[in-house]
């Protein structure tokens, strides 16, 4: 990201000083003072407020969210609280007229998501969802590959997210809105929706608990079918050991496959040599000859890189946040996409044993 801007930094108020805030959000604010200035912070735990106070001596501290929202010298409220409170806290912020950056998932049900959408519309569409998956370099490569004619007719998109973690936090507890269907899948679903050529019309899903120490799922496998020939096979696995990881994206076509590892900025296109043409042949109902029907097919591996100048990774997301708040440029993640992701996440959750 650029470090010099003619416009002043966005004045940010932090709501919820937990792991997500300090791991994903806060380092960005610290690293880019020309873009963001933390002016207020709210959490019930004093020790966490003290961390912010040490870095930002002039930052105003609060225990109650409602008190912080009475401050007027704020441009954007960054909400990273318990999933159960996302809708409530976002509505409170939007009603005060602040730009509101909300951690995923935006809600637990489609009804809640629609309620939040209504409030966002009343507040001049100042709700920004923290969905960074569409800026991941491996996703951008997969989207680029979807239009590569060397793959031939594409029939399947495969997405994999794998880790091994024995979660023991509230994200592993059902009654607190935990479970991979919510904390992991909304970003992945948005990626799938952007890759598929048409909207899904059918979904199959399976949820399991593998390594998690709570009662919520840490494994989700879904298949999205469209009216076209392309389907999406998606899996999040919180119990996959290191060294046994699959490519994060595979684009499968009639002439080959594109593969890329998680977070990688280069992938491999493995296809039948584009210069090769099959000899003409057609199927027959006659008694077949006693022979092997396999053919010698020339296969080539082609390294795949992002187009020059493509912005990717977390820096691309946060640059868009700044530009939207400061210059009113369109935010690249439409609210309808986040709502659609919640619809699928809630559906897979409520139809599983983990939704009971």
Each PLM stretch: what is its role?
Residues 250, 255-332, 336:
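C-terminal glycine/acidic-rich active-site capping loop/insertion
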Residues 102, 127-129, 260:
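Hydrophobic residues in well-ordered beta-strands that form the structural core
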Residues 56-119, 313-316:
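Beta-loop-alpha module in the N-terminal Rossmann-like domain of NAD(P)-dependent dehydrogenases
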Residues 1-56:
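N-terminal Rossmann-like dinucleotide-binding module
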Residues 235-243:
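Glycine-rich phosphate/pyrophosphate-binding beta-alpha loops
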Residues 1-6, 76-78, 306-356:
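C-terminal helix-rich "cap/oligomerization" subdomain common to oxidoreductases
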Residues 126, 133-213:
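Predominantly a Rossmann-like dinucleotide-binding segment in NAD(P)-dependent oxidoreductases
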């Amino acid at each position: 990201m650029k470090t010099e801007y003619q416009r002043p930094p966005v004045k940010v108020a932090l709501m919820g000083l937990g792991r997500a805030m300090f791991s994903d959000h806060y380092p960005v604010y610290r690293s880019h003072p020309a873009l963001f200035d933390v002016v207020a912070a709210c959490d019930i735990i004093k020790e966490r407020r003290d961390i912010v106070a040490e870095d930002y001596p002039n930052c105003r501290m609060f225990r109650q969210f409602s008190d912080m929202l009475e401050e007027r010298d704020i441009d954007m409220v960054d909400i990273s609280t318990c999933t159960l409170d996302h809708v409530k806290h976002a509505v409170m912020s939007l009603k005060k007229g602040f730009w509101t950056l909300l951690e995923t998932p935006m809600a637990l049900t489609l009804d809640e998501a629609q309620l939040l959408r209504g409030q966002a519309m009343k507040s001049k569409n100042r709700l920004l969802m923290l969905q960074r998956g569409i800026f991941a370099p491996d996703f951008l490569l997969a989207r680029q590959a979807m239009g590569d004619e060397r793959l031939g007719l594409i029939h399947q998109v495969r997405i994999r997210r794998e880790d091994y973690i024995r979660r023991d936090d509230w994200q592993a507890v059902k009654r607190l809105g935990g479970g991979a269907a919510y904390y992991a899948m909304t970003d992945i679903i948005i990626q799938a929706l952007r890759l598929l050529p048409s909207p899904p019309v059918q979904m199959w899903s399976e949820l399991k608990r593998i390594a998690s120490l709570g009662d919520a799922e840490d494994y989700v496998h879904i298949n999205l079918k469209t009216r076209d020939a392309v389907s999406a096979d998606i899996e999040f696995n919180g119990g996959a050991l290191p060294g046994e990881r699959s490519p994060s994206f595979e684009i499968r076509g009639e002439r080959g496959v594109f593969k890329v590892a998680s977070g990688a900025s280069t992938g491999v296109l493995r296809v039948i040599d584009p210069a090769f043409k099959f000899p003409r042949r057609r199927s027959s109902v006659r008694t077949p000859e006693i022979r092997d029907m396999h053919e010698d097919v020339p296969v080539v591996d082609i390294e795949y890189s992002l187009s020059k100048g493509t912005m990717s990774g977390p820096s691309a997301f946060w640059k868009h946040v700044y530009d939207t708040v400061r210059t009113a440029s369109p935010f690249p993640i439409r609210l309808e996409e986040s709502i659609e992701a919640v619809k699928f996440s809630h559906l897979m959750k409520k139809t599983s044993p983990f939704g009971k």
